[in-house]
């Protein structure tokens, strides 16, 4: 390793660069982005300005209406009650048409709005609304230090709720009444009460949450979603779904409870579709009302909007604008029915392309008008926020992880079908940098250079998207994952990203309904302390022996990890059993192929393919580097004893504990003058040990072994659907809060500091041999059995500047994928700009960066995550 580079980063905040002698960081200023975009019309400029000035607000209209209906329909069969309650809720939501928009409908009344789904979890929201003491410690530990003006509502009549939102004061009391009703009926508390007596591993689960192996309070508040709906259903019209359900009921003779449930499900679907159509008609009425009091040209726009809403989603769209409105309506319907994070549009460019081409040929629309619509959609997606407990806020701001993909191949023919509308989607991403939807490029060996270079241009805009995915490997994974279910090649090809970086089948695959992020850093800490957590004093597991050899370290680590991975997977199976009886998906099932035909919701084996449930992970590279350091320094070089190594680690390598100062950043950690000299040399030696990401088999072999063991455990457990669990190697940004509860680790990371961000991302500042070495390390692990892997890279803008730079950039990615790589995403930014943005946030309101599986506004990230992005090695050359 480059001598003491990481130590220098800790003490000075310097960003590592490659090549190490590059001069790009030495100048006074910073290098700006090569590609810049602005909204293409005055209309979208105004829409962006309103969005950027909007405050994050809670809207309780939906849960209050839904709960009123739920109580009103008590005694009805579950699916019928769900459909009726959802219908009532939609019929009673206030239609809000925002200035300038041509595509309308939203989940809340606000430009940046979130609602709450108390059917899943209530306790954290009750604590927020009552300012309860039990939330204060967690809020302090998981504070979002970077909270900016978007999260501060200074209007009269509003009160803070959680760290990021505010709520109308008059809604607090009725919402608390709703929450009290659901408190003993929600998924979180019903499953918890049940498992206290029925789940043998219950206490292990509780202890694991307390020490930080799993997320803490409000785990169930983000437990739904991550799928790609069958949006083609709405292109056929919801009246068609109603007719299908009625025909199914008419020809069904009820003989068993299972058959009766099918009939109840179809009835629930009918009610849900009727509610959706009524909601669209309410918007149409509002558009006509506004048209009566609005001058031209907006008057005509509102009348045209009304015509579209009177057509879709009830009937098939006839043109491009109706098709876009239909798809957006479907999106809002699904995310209004449930928590539904990561409900991803998939390849909308392919679905909309026939409408676009026809209208373009007929002179109904121009390319410029279509681009404006794509820019509008970015605003529409970004208005939809969600609220979570403090831990989740620290992880992901209020991002909903919706993913729009371009590229890939035609599912039927396997041929390249890149189209002009996908170019416009990418251009809209350049012109309108918003966190939602994130963009993904599905790169196949058959993908045209034209689309790949357009995606490169979008990447060079520096907003962290598109992420790049090996489409051919995605198809290979699908053929493996769903082989037992007889997947066809057409369905295997019909895939995109469900949420951040997870491979998902479009319209046929079961949602990945859970939010677990396993903390690898905490596991190695427990392995070195005989199963006792130093922070809490809790002993999570017996039989963890004192360390006398490297084999003891390894055995302790895998023993603890295997046990608690199984604890979580089995726990979640029982949670979903409760969810099926409390809040089965109705609208989500309508937009999933075969559910209506089968008479079963997506939660209960209604999908065509159901083997897609995954377990997530963070901090693995910290463990790998730590194992390598211990193996080398203690048992190979014999430079230190295990006792000396552990003593240094337990004393935070001579640095002040971050928790004492509230400083969890990996940059600018404070030296403890009484201890530092004693542990400085061992810390330096640890930091200079072999690190993953440098094409060094000594550490890379450990990396592969660690992940193969993880994959072994997930694959040996059975999901609530009766299929094996699947490994998903991503962290979103769980590495932030997981790091805060984890002490110093044997890789030299300090206590409380952010863990490594993904599976393949090197620990910041340690990948000193360049980008080729990093990807060569990564491809030593075969990801075919993984639903996702995650590799973050950061390039200085000068590294890929110009047309030649773009070509080299695409060649680099193609080479990586040909070597067996699955995913890579980039920040193309000068770290000096990021530091300037920390100092002068008012100048960077719309600056975005890639965090993990999503992009976020820089000013809305906590400082530890900001510093982790800054600390990532910045490549000055390919």
From Swiss-Prot:
Residues 758-878 form the Glycine radical domain. The keyword Transferase applies. It is an enzyme of class 4 (lyase). Residues 42-750 form the PFL domain. Gene3D superfamilies: 3.20.70.20. Glycyl radical enzyme that catalyzes the terminal step of tryptophan fermentation, the decarboxylation of indoleacetate to form skatole, a malodorous compound that contributes to the characteristic smell of animal feces. No activity is detected with phenylacetate or p-hydroxyphenylacetate as substrates, indicating high substrate specificity. This is Indoleacetate decarboxylase. It comes from Tractidigestivibacter scatoligenes.
């Amino acid at each position: 390793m480059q001598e003491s580079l990481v130590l220098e980063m800790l003490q000075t905040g310097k960003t590592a660069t490659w090549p190490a002698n590059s001069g790009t960081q030495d100048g006074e200023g910073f290098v700006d982005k090569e590609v810049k975009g602005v909204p293409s019309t005055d209309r979208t400029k105004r829409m962006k300005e309103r969005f950027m000035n909007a405050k994050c607000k809670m809207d309780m209209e939906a849960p209050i209406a839904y709960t009123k209906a739920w109580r009103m329909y008590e005694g009805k069969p579950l699916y019928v009650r769900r459909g009726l309650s959802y219908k009532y809720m939609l019929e009673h939501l206030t239609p809000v048409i925002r200035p300038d928009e041509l595509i309308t409908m939203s989940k809340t009344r606000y430009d940046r709005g979130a609602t709450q789904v108390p059917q899943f979890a209530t306790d954290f929201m009750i604590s927020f609304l009552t300012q309860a003491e039990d939330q204060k410690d967690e809020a302090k530990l998981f504070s979002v230090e970077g909270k900016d003006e978007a999260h501060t509502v200074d209007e009269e009549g509003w009160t803070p709720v959680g760290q990021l939102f505010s709520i109308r004061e008059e809604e607090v009391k009725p919402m608390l009444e709703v929450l009290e009703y659901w408190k003993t009926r929600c998924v979180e508390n019903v499953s918890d009460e049940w498992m206290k007596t029925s789940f043998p591993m219950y206490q292990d689960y509780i202890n694991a949450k307390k020490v930080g192996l799993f997320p803490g309070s409000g785990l169930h508040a983000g437990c739904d979603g991550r799928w790609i709906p069958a949006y083609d259903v709405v292109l056929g019209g919801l009246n068609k779904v109603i007719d299908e359900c009625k025909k199914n009921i008419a020809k069904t003779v009820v003989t068993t409870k299972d058959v009766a449930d099918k009939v109840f499900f179809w009835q629930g679907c009918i009610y849900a579709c009727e509610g959706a159509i009524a909601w669209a008609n309410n918007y149409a009425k509002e558009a006509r009302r506004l048209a009566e009091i609005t001058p031209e040209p907006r008057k005509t726009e509102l009348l045209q909007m009304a015509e579209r809403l009177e057509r879709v989603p009830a009937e098939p769209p006839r043109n491009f604008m109706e098709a876009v409105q239909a798809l957006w309506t479907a999106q809002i319907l699904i995310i209004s029915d449930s928590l539904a994070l990561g409900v991803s549009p998939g390849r909308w460019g392919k679905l909309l392309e026939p409408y676009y081409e026809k209208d373009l040929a007929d002179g109904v629309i121009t390319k410029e008008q279509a681009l404006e619509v794509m820019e509008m959609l970015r605003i529409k997606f970004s208005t939809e926020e969600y609220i979570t407990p403090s831990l989740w806020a620290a992880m992901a701001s209020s991002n909903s992880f919706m993913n729009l993909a371009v590229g890939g191949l035609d599912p039927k023919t396997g041929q390249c079908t890149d189209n002009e509308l996908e170019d416009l989607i990418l251009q809209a991403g350049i012109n309108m940098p918003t966190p939602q939807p994130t963009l993904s490029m599905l790169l196949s060996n058959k993908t045209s250079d034209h689309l790949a270079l357009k995606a490169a241009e979008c990447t060079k805009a520096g907003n962290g998207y598109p992420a790049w995915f090996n489409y051919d490997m995605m198809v290979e994974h699908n053929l493996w994952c769903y082989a037992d279910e007889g997947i066809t090649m057409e369905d295997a090809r019909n895939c995109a990203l469900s949420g951040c970086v997870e491979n998902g089948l479009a319209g046929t695959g079961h949602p990945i309904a859970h939010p677990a992020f396993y903390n690898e850093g905490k596991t190695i800490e427990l392995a070195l302390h005989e199963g006792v957590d130093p922070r809490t004093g809790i002993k999570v597991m017996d039989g963890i022996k004192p360390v006398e050899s490297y084999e003891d370290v390894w055995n302790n680590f895998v023993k603890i990890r295997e046990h608690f991975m199984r604890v979580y997977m089995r726990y979640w199976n029982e949670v979903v059993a409760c969810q099926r009886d409390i809040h089965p998906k109705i609208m989500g099932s309508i937009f999933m192929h075969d559910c209506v035909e089968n008479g079963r919701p997506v939660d209960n084996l209604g999908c065509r393919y159901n083997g897609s449930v995954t377990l997530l992970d963070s901090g693995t590279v910290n463990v790998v580097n730590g194992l390598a350091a211990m193996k080398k320094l203690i048992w190979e070089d014999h430079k230190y004893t295990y006792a000396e190594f552990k003593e240094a680690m337990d004393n935070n390598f001579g640095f002040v504990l971050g928790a004492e100062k509230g400083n969890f950043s990996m940059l600018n950690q404070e030296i403890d003058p009484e201890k530092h000299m004693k542990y400085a040399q061992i810390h330096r030696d640890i930091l200079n040990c072999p690190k993953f990401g440098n094409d060094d088999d000594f550490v890379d072999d450990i990396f592969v072994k660690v992940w193969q063991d993880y994959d072994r455990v997930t694959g040996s457990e059975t999901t609530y659907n009766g299929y094996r669990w699947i490994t998903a190697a991503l962290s979103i940004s769980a590495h932030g809060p997981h790091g805060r509860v984890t002490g110093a680790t044997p890789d030299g990371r300090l206590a409380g500091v952010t863990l490594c961000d993904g599976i393949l991302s090197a620990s910041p500042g340690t990948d000193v041999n360049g980008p080729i070495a990093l990807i060569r390390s990564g491809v030593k692990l075969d990801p075919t059995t993984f639903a996702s892997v995650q590799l973050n890279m950061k390039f200085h803008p000068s590294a890929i500047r110009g047309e030649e730079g773009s070509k080299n950039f695409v060649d680099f990615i193609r080479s990586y994928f040909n070597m067996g790589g699955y995913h890579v995403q980039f920040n193309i930014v000068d770290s000096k700009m990021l530091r300037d943005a920390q100092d002068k946030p008012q100048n960077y309101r719309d600056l975005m960066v890639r965090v993990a599986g999503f992009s976020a506004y820089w000013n809305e990230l906590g400082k530890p995550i900001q510093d982790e992005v800054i600390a990532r090695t910045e490549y000055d050359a390919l």
